[in-house]
C-alpha cells in the first residue's frame, strides 16, 4: 500500500494528487470558476489552473539538464589523473628500453631470420626474394 504522491514524469503523466495541496483564497475562487464554461476563462487563468494541478509542463520535463558537463568534467579529471600516474611510472618505475628495440638490432635480427629461412612456406621468408635480396612485391 502506498500513499498517493505527486511526481512529474513523462511515463506517468497523471499523478495521483495535485501539485498544490493547500489552495489560497484566489486559487479556491479560480477552482470554482473552473466548474463553469472554460471559454469564460482567460489564458492566464487556464495556466494558473494548470500550475495548480501540475508543477511542470511536458516541455519543461523534456528540457535538457547540464548534468553532462559534470559527467564529462569528472571523466576528464580521472583521465588526467591516470595520465599523471602513467607519466610518473614511465619516469620512476620502468627501466630503460631494452636494446632489442634498437633499429640496428631489429635489422640484424631480421637478417638472421632471413638467413635461417624462417617459415618459408607462408611466413616471414616466403615474402623475401633471395635472388634480388629485397622484399617481394
Curated annotation (Swiss-Prot):
Range of residues in the leader sequence: none
Keyword Mitochondrion listed = yes
The protein's location, in the record's own words, is: Mitochondrion inner membrane
Q: In which pathway does it act?
A: Energy metabolism; oxidative phosphorylation
Pfam families found in the cross-reference section: COX4
PTM-bearing positions, type N6-acetyllysine: 21, 28, 35
The stretches that face the Mitochondrial intermembrane side, renumbered to this chain, are 93-137
Name a biological process GO annotation. mitochondrial electron transport, cytochrome c to oxygen
Please name the SUPFAM superfamilies in this protein's record: Mitochondrial cytochrome c oxidase subunit IV
Q: What keyword terms does UniProt attach to this protein?
A: Acetylation, Membrane, Mitochondrion, Mitochondrion inner membrane, Phosphoprotein, Transmembrane, Transmembrane helix
Q: Which residues carry this modification: N6-succinyllysine?
A: 28
Q: What does this protein do?
A: Component of the cytochrome c oxidase, the last enzyme in the mitochondrial electron transport chain which drives oxidative phosphorylation. The respiratory chain contains 3 multisubunit complexes succinate dehydrogenase (complex II, CII), ubiquinol-cytochrome c oxidoreductase (cytochrome b-c1 complex, complex III, CIII) and cytochrome c oxidase (complex IV, CIV), that cooperate to transfer electrons derived from NADH and succinate to molecular oxygen, creating an electrochemical gradient over the inner membrane that drives transmembrane transport and the ATP synthase.
Q: How does it assemble?
A: Component of the cytochrome c oxidase (complex IV, CIV), a multisubunit enzyme composed of 14 subunits. The complex is composed of a catalytic core of 3 subunits MT-CO1, MT-CO2 and MT-CO3, encoded in the mitochondrial DNA, and 11 supernumerary subunits COX4I, COX5A, COX5B, COX6A, COX6B, COX6C, COX7A, COX7B, COX7C, COX8 and NDUFA4, which are encoded in the nuclear genome.
Q: What is this protein called?
A: Cytochrome c oxidase subunit 4 isoform 1, mitochondrial
In its UniProt entry, the species of origin is given as Perodicticus potto edwarsi (Potto)
